[in-house]
Amino acid sequence: MILTIKIWRLSLAKFLNMRRFVGLLLILLVGFAVYRFYIKPKYKSESGPKMAPIALKEHTERFNGSVDKMMAAYLDIKNAFVEEDTGRAKQSTQIFIALLDSVPLQELKKDTASIFETAQSNLNDIKANAASLLSQSDINEMRKDFSMVTEMLYPSFFKTINYEGPQLYLQNCPMAFGDDQPANWISNNIQVVNPYLGKQHPKYKATMLHCGSVKDSIRGK
């Protein structure tokens, strides 16, 4: 009987000691958590905030000037289609093709050969579609070639050369060649003036002249 009581007291003492140990452990854990999340100061990088990369001018004035002149001719083609003037559209296209050849792509070789080759391929595709426009007699077919020239210019050519000229806008007509055939064009004005439906459309007349939307902003540096 006495032995049983001693064993029971010993077990109770161990139990109480265990409870004190667990209680102390909990206090330590809670204290650490308070310090970790509420008291300890946050680490601050000595290098400071990360800076955005600075855009540097990469092309010469000659290169950018030639691209600007090329785009001025493109915009003349667009404006001719707004007026339904096929003669002016072809004349402006001839100027546009000549100005394509004046872009000094050799300057791009200072970057990498692949950039030069891609830009050269882009210009060849643009020139082929512009030449096709000259061979057309139907204004609708001419406009289709104009839309292909646009697709080759942006994003293809402009992205390749890292365009640095004045701000332009990529605009879209959802029904350029029918209710479900959209087409894009580039403008130097955010206001939509549609070269595919124009001022003298056989069905809509001038009522759809401002039909369309701005899809993208083409920002130079």
Feature locations, PLM:
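Intrinsically disordered, low-complexity terminal tails/loops enriched in metal-binding residues
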Residues: I2-K221
